[in-house]
Regions:
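Alpha-helical hydrophobic membrane-insertion segments
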Residues: 4, 19-22
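Carbohydrate-interacting regions of secretory-pathway proteins
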Residues: 23-260
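Bacterial N-terminal signal peptides
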Residues: 8-19
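Positively charged n-region of N-terminal signal peptides that target proteins for export
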Residues: 1-7
Length: 260
């Protein structure tokens, strides 16, 4: 009995310590954010980490909702609700320039999202014009997709950045043409009945299996050249993928809804 009590106490202490550590890191990054203008070219770039060789896709969890099955876009529409105009072939879907972003027919709040993506194997352009797209949670909160392999750009717009806010902790990008993974744990913002913010959105993100955001608190919706404040919105909204004019590919997209 004593051993059990000691084990419980130690576990509680460890969890409390981890919670304080994450909170301290979040506060530190929030303080650092104030130092930098949005898309500041002088902001330090994240250190490069080799994620290792590509790995085969993992099986889809039994309780997951498959958003893209490699065959069709029946789960998606364009931004106006019409059929999605991207090209499906060979088990992936590719952005068609000027066809517009696409979004899921279903809406989601708190979730675990898995996305696999690849930029063109023969890169063209540089900076933000090289393999640019984005994964949007609730159509408002973007994790940047970009070819960041030997391709410098502003830090808060690099691959796996919470766009316009936080660069990834490291640059874990693979070579152009290689398949990459995002695993995103997302907690939606909370608003009261008057539309006042009760709790901000948070993200934990793994890029190619490497932690790049650790329960990071978002300052508001992500945007280009702006950091707008939160505005009340529905508890659940679609996931969307961005058409930024580059032929980025996606495959094996699934989501698990989480309890609040």
């Amino acid at each position: 009995m004593v051993k059990v009590m000691i084990s419980v106490i130690l576990s509680t202490m460890v969890m409390g310590f981890l919670g304080l550590t994450v909170a301290a890191q979040t506060n530190r990054r929030a303080a650092e954010l104030k130092k930098w203008r949005i898309h500041d070219e002088t902001r330090p770039l994240p250190p490069i980490v080799d994620p290792g060789p590509q790995q085969p896709s993992l099986p889809v969890p039994s309780d997951a909702i498959v958003l893209f099955n490699g065959k069709d876009l029946l789960q998606w529409t364009n931004s106006k609700g019409a059929p999605a105009g991207w090209q499906v072939k060979d088990g992936y879907v590719e952005v068609v320039n000027k066809s517009g972003s696409i979004k899921t027919k279903r809406a989601f709040g708190d979730c675990q999202l898995h996305v696999e993506w690849a930029t063109p194997s023969e890169p063209t352009g540089s900076g933000q014009d090289r393999g640019n797209s984005g994964v949007f949670l609730m159509e408002n909160y973007e994790v940047q997709v970009l070819d960041s392999y030997n391709n410098a750009t502003y830090a808060d717009g690099s691959a796996a950045a919470i766009y316009g806010q936080y660069p990834p902790l490291v640059n874990a990008c693979r070579k152009p043409g290689e398949w990459q993974t995002y695993d995103i744990l997302f907690r939606a913002p909370r608003f009261d009945g008057n539309g006042e913010l009760l709790a901000p959105a948070r993200m934990t993100v793994f890029h190619n299996g490497i932690l790049v955001h650790d329960n990071q608190e978002l300052t508001g919706p992500t945007a280009h050249k702006a950091r707008p404040p939160y505005k009340a919105h529905a508890d659940k909204l679609p996931v969307s993928l961005q058409d930024h004019g580059n032929p980025v590919r996606y495959r094996n997209i699934w989501i698990r809804e989480l309890q609040p």
